Amino acid sequence: MTKKLYLPLLMAMVVALFSSCSKKMGELSADYFTVTPQVLEAVGGKVPATINGKFPEKYFNKKAVVEVTPVLKWNGGEAKGQPATFQGEKVEGNDQTISYKMGGSYTMKTSFDYVPEMAKSELYLEFKATIGKKVVTIPAVKIADGVISTSELVNNTLGNANPALGEDAFQRIIKEKHDANIMFLIQQANIRSSELKTAKEFNKEVANVNEAANKKISNIEVSAYASPDGGVSLNTTLAENRENNTTKLLSKDLKKAKIDAPIDAKYTAQDWEGFQELVSKSNIQDKELILRVLSMYQDPAQREQEIKNISSVYKTLADEILPQLRRSRLTLNYEIIGKSDEEIAKLASSNPSELNVEELLYAATLTNDPAKQEAIYTQATKQFPNDYRAFNNLGKLAYQAGNVDKAESYFKKAASVNASPEVNMNLGLISLIKGDKAAAETYFGKAAGTKELGESMGNLYIAQGQYERAVNSFGDSKTNSAALAQILAKDYNKAKNTLANVERPDAYTDYLMAVLGARTNNSSMVTSSLKSAVAKDPSLAKKAATDLEFAKYFTNADFMSIAK
């Protein structure tokens, strides 16, 4: 009897034991998870990842609630992503339900703010599970390595960028002209004595230009006109005679003054163009009607008749407009010849006060020595403190020397004088190199027309993770950043050409060439370029030792002898 009682009890205990075992939720294999990208990569200052996970069949307890959190771990720190929660079939809730019998799949998107320590890190999934009120331990699972941080090199390649120059407006040869008008009475071509004074003053200016050491006469133009009233035949003869008489007088005066200057003479029979210009600038009655007649009719006779039909204004035209068109215009064309490069360079160092602002700024372009350029620009700020360009250009020199704070100080001083597009672009570079992408974008928005803007926007697009857009923005620019964009966009041939032609190559030029070698399976390019990079900047050896771009070279003796 006793045995009969114990046997059912024993069976019940066995069933209960197996039942409790079925509720156990243990360790999950990494095989249940895939991560895109397989090796995490920094993009636009973030480390994004898409995780596809699976709970296997007969794993997820019907009463379980599991919170899954992506955690990126590195030596001395970690960053947690957005968790996702899943529930069993008997749980009342709003989370994704996982079948006990069939299991279930899920997708999680996560992103971490990049910090340099993440260069050598691992991505885990951590689980917080409960079955009813009982806490269940599910071990964390490593699912990916990280982080390829090549895009973050923009913070280094920015030092190789080209700040905008406040350009000089120096012109060695400046073209100038001097005009005078000899006026005629209606239907007359003789030069009146009252107009000889004008001719005399004009000739005096010609003589002054001819005698000046830094001026050279190009030619003298004589343009004679007749007003559009009267027939074409009459006005043609009239204009031609005015041109002949003016040219004769001018030639006589030039010969007397012993001035050899070419004379180019022409005449216009009916000066409709001058008529239209004077009418449009006047306040006469029915001005718009007259201008409409000129636009409607091209035949001179019809134009004249239609305008005469506007009787209310014709007298005003005859008294105020037409007399101004009966003239010969004298134009002296000449060149002002500036100082030679040798003169400017010498004065810049010996007596800069003899130079104007354009000459002084130009002097800085005559040398490639940054120290001499700095001295010239500094002198320019003293002589011309209200000109922003010298301050801006001192900032450019400081930036290219790697002194970002000094550069920013000069750019801000330049902005206080004149917040020009060049200065705004340069302040944008400063913001970008300091990690403030929003401020950089604002500054670049105020830099329209600056020729270096495309390059600067390319740097911004790299920082934002827009690599194709960056490549397009850089165009044919030959800088480290341009090559970086091309590498990130996987245009390796173009990147190689860019790196080979960088104007001011530095350690990062070589480092990028090593990365390019790794991506194109060129081991000799990797080692030779990295060796050159480390020779210029020894700190890059440590970086290369953990840079996942070189992961397959971590067991290469030649590589490790450099990256140590």
Predicted regions and their residues:
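N-terminal targeting segments with Sec-dependent signals, encompassing both cleavable signal peptides
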Residues: 2-513, 517-546, 552, 560-564
